[in-house]
């Protein structure tokens, strides 16, 4: 038996004062022997993925208390990357992940909570909470707010499914009228929930299922659908069972690290590669593993990327497939089932809901189960009504998408490609690696060579693209945008969207030590490590240097000799205080908080986590 953490503050004569304070929160004598479970919410009216979470914490809390626990809710911050995009607000997005992780750790440890339910949804909130869970290593259940419904726009006589990225691209398209852009804007984000494609938020909530830390349906059941309520209720009941198993039964295998082992991380990245998830997920998985002392590195991701097929393509990789379509095809367990049959998963790992992944697949993979409740779950469809309310509709599809040859989810035999949707590249400008979402790269440019167009900020890149100073065949280099150099490792969604708008999406490459939105597609290579600000070779490139990209062979190099690089490095170092900084000072406000972040953060190959002093 493992002592309950909460008894530190609820038992013993010396804790009379603490108990007095607990009583002031509503606890009574009968509560002091029960587990105290933190309900970690992230409600905010700033973010559509979180606007509907206000009452859901108390929904979970009631289930916890009905099952024999004491629930205590608190909130953490949530940044909307789409609203923060394209201005200095984006400097705060990635650093907010560390603030979220710290705040959860601080609250849970300060109050000696025994376990937690994490109610997350959008880009940095899920990974931030997961980092905290890995630090704390207590029982945890993740339940997200769910995906947004895809928007619908009638363009050129055709009804198209659209999302936030379409609005951004069309706004920069000179061929679109103001009225057409307005139509995209008003319909791109029709409901509450995380943006509807396989962007970072949805990618992370899907990976939570593969890690074993979330219930089936977590990543794909729409925020608006009535079926999602059952996930929240079940999460509240299940955390009490896990907590008692851990403390009273001594089962350490149900803690966060007990579930999220190295094998589970490998399952998660295998899913990520198979579904062409956001490149940000690589950053977050590396960070989570580091916080949990799991030996999972970029080398593991590189190894698995070479042998994992691409089984699912979702927006932004393709136009008309969104999370609601993945759900109809069986959701994440539909993809995991195909990976399992292909021998690409370790099905012996535990999950929060079954003793092994094999058992979970037998129950939740629509290709093998006849359970009508499971089939009913994956028939949950979009309602098509603008709303900010959770569980506000109960519409259902007439049938499931079980076509594994040409459907949304493919079998390994009928894969979109034999190697998957994410790749790690190495070379003389990325000695510690960089990443690319291959699911969004046209086959014609998997090998690409062209002259470098050097930009020392995202703003400079946007200006050059919009002023048509980037032409077909160019390789746009955006540097000094890494975790330290930005600081904050901004997402480069606007430059990639503008390349598309200028009809250069299949004609140019973009390389950066920054990162990309989950909405990015095209030959967009990010996370270049080491970054320019720490002496990376990307900082030594000159305008016109020929850059060679070879995704099939996982290489990225500048046609610059080692001797020339050494000469350039010596010249850079000789600049003293001006070395490894943009040539011209950028009009960028860097607060004290961001300076502190920059002083301690590691590069992307390490997950951009803070390094120990």
From Swiss-Prot:
Its biological purpose: Functions in the biosynthesis of branched-chain amino acids. Catalyzes the dehydration of (2R,3R)-2,3-dihydroxy-3-methylpentanoate (2,3-dihydroxy-3-methylvalerate) into 2-oxo-3-methylpentanoate (2-oxo-3-methylvalerate) and of (2R)-2,3-dihydroxy-3-methylbutanoate (2,3-dihydroxyisovalerate) into 2-oxo-3-methylbutanoate (2-oxoisovalerate), the penultimate precursor to L-isoleucine and L-valine, respectively.
Q: Which family does it belong to?
A: Belongs to the IlvD/Edd family.
Keywords, A to Z, come to:
2Fe-2S, Amino-acid biosynthesis, Branched-chain amino acid biosynthesis, Iron, Iron-sulfur, Lyase, Magnesium, Metal-binding
> What is one cellular component GO term in this UniProt entry?
cytosol
Which taxonomic lineage does the organism of this UniProt entry have?
Answer: Bacteria, Pseudomonadati, Pseudomonadota, Alphaproteobacteria, Hyphomonadales
Annotated binding of [2Fe-2S] cluster, by residue: 122, 195
UniProt key word Mitochondrion: no
Citing just one GO molecular function, the answer is: dihydroxy-acid dehydratase activity
Pathway(s) of this molecule: Amino-acid biosynthesis; L-isoleucine biosynthesis; L-isoleucine from 2-oxobutanoate: step 3/4; Amino-acid biosynthesis; L-valine biosynthesis; L-valine from pyruvate: step 3/4
Tell me the residues on which N6-carboxylysine occurs. 124
Cite the record's note on assembly.
Homodimer.
What is the protein name for this chain? Dihydroxy-acid dehydratase
Q: What is its EC number?
A: 4.2.1.9
Active site residues per record: 517 (proton acceptor)
């Amino acid at each position: 038996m493992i002592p309950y953490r909460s008894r530190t503050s609820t038992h013993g004569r010396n804790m009379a004062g603490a108990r007095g304070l607990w009583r002031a929160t509503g606890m009574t004598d009968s509560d002091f022997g029960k587990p105290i479970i933190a309900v970690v919410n992230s409600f905010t009216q700033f973010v559509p993925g979180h606007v509907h979470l206000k009452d859901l914490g108390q929904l979970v809390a009631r289930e916890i208390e009905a099952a024999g626990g004491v629930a205590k809710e608190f909130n953490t911050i949530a940044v909307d990357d789409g609203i923060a995009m394209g201005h200095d607000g984006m400097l705060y997005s990635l650093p907010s992940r560390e603030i979220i992780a710290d705040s959860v750790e601080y609250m849970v440890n300060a109050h000696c909570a025994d376990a937690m339910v994490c109610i997350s949804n959008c880009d940095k909130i899920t990974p931030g909470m997961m980092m905290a869970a890995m630090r704390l290593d207590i029982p945890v259940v993740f339940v997200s707010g769910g995906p947004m419904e895809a928007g619908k726009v009638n363009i050129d006589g055709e009804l198209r499914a659209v999302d936030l990225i379409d609005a951004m691209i069309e706004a920069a398209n000179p061929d679109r009228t103001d009225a057409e852009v307005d139509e995209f804007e008003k319909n791109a984000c029709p409901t509450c929930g995380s943006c509807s494609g396989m962007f970072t938020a949805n990618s992370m909530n899907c990976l939570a299922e593969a890690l074993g830390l979330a219930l089936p349906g977590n990543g794909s059941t729409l925020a608006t659908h009535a079926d999602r309520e059952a996930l929240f209720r079940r999460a509240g009941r299940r955390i009490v069972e896990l907590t008692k198993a851990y403390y009273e039964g001594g089962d350490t295998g149900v803690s966060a690290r007990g579930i999220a082992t190295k094998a589970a991380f490998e399952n998660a990245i295998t899913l990520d590669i198979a579904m062409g998830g956001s490149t940000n997920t690589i950053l977050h998985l590396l960070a989570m593993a580091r916080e949990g002392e799991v030996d999972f590195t970029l080398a593991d991701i590189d190894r698995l990327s070479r042998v994992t097929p691409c089984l699912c393509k979702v927006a932004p990789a393709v136009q008309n497939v969104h999370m609601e379509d993945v759900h109809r095809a069986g959701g994440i367990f539909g993809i995991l089932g195909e990976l399992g049959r292909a021998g690409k998963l370790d099905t012996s790992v535990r999950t929060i809901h079954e003793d092994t992944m094999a058992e979970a697949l037998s129950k939740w993979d629509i290709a093998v189960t006849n359970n009508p409740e499971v089939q009913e779950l994956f028939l949950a469809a979009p309602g098509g009504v603008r709303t900010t309310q959770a569980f506000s509709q109960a519409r259902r599809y007439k049938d499931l998408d079980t076509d594994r040859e040409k459907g949304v989810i493919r079998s390994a035999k009928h894969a979109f490609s034999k190697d998957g949707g994410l790749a790690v590249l190495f070379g003389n400008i990325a000695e510690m690696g960089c990443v690319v979402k291959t699911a969004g790269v046209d086959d014609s440019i998997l090998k690409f060579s062209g002259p470098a167009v050097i930009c020392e900020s995202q703003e400079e890149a946007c200006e050059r693209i919009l002023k048509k100073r980037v032409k077909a065949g160019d390789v746009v280099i955006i540097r000094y945008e890494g975790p330290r150099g930005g600081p904050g490792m901004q997402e480069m969604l606007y430059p990639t969207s503008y390349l598309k708008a200028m009809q250069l999406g299949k004609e140019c490459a973009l390389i950066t030590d920054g990162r990309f939105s989950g909405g990015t597609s095209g030959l967009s290579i990010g996370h270049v490590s080491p970054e320019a600000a720490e002496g990376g070779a990307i900082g030594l490139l000159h305008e016109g240097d020929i850059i060679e990209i070879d995704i099939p062979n996982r290489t990225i190099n500048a046609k610059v000799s080692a001797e020339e690089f050494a000469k350039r490095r010596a010249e850079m170092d000789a600049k003293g205080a001006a070395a490894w900084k943009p040539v011209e000072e950028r009009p960028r406000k860097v607060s004290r908080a961001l300076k502190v972040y920059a002083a301690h953060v590691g590069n992307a190959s390490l997950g951009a986590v803070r390094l120990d002093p």
